[in-house]
Regions:
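Glycine-rich phosphate-binding loop of actin/hexokinase-like ATP-binding domains
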Residues: 126-168
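Nucleotide/phosphate-binding catalytic cleft detector across ATP-hydrolyzing
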Residues: 1-130, 147-149, 169-217
Length: 217
């Protein structure tokens, strides 16, 4: 199986590598050497590389090359996006899978897996930002020219919205979660002013009627 990884420990950054092409024609070995040069960056011992994602290759002065194999040139440069994560987090994911009787072929950043599932090639080409809102984190992946430009994780998720609803409406957490799912709206203008919802109170008090627009705002 392929196991997904996410969380606030995930970090992404851009790097590049440059090599001299041997023989005047780009070979698989040249591409491998360029990628090795790009990933030759200092990474803390408690982190590991999850992905090295090529953004573009440059052969001499030709930019924007997706696959330089077989091209003539003397200088090969590659720009990459490197994703790293905590070693212990990756190990715990693998161990959990093994305990369930599953063999892990590889670990994949969840936002990249989501992008493969929901984004079209055209969207990735013209530029798009994928935002995956989870319970505790918000995963972000930005694409342009059909390559990854940025990945990031915000320590904010659906649970934060639930907490805000519970605090703002003085209602239990379980009730706040149900209200969010059933009545939540991201744009207040899309809610009719005559829409009302029932909000349970804490401490056994009577439930209250509240405008749905107040919730959306």
């Amino acid at each position: 199986v392929y196991a997904g990884i996410a969380g606030s420990h995930i970090k992404g950054f851009n790097s590049h590598g440059v090599i001299a092409v041997k023989g005047g024609e780009v070979s698989p070995r040249d591409i491998e050497r360029a990628l090795d040069a790009a990933k030759a960056v200092a990474i803390p011992l408690d982190r590991e590389v999850i992905h090295i994602l090529p953004q573009e290759y440059i052969v001499d002065d030709q930019r924007g090359i997706a696959d330089p194999m077989g091209m003539a040139g003397v200088r090969l440069e590659v720009k990459v996006h490197i994703v790293t994560g905590a070693v212990t987090s990756a190990q715990n994911i693998v161990r959990s899978c093994h305990k369930s009787g599953l063999d892990v072929s590889d670990i994949v950043l969840e936002s990249l897996a989501s992008a493969k599932a929901v984004l079209t090639e055209e969207e990735r080409e013209i530029g798009v930002a994928l935002i995956d809102l989870g319970g505790g984190t918000c995963d972000i992946a930005i694409f342009a020219n059909d390559s990854i430009k940025h990945t990031g994780v915000l320590a904010l998720g659906g649970q934060n919205l639930t907490n805000d609803i519970a605090f703002g409406l003085r209602t239990p957490m379980a009730a706040a979660e149900k209200i969010k799912i059933k009545h939540g709206a991201a744009i207040a203008e899309m809610v009719r002013p005559d829409e009302y919802i029932e909000v349970p109170s804490v401490g056994g008090r009577e439930p209250r009627r509240l405008s749905r627009q107040v919730l959306a705002e």
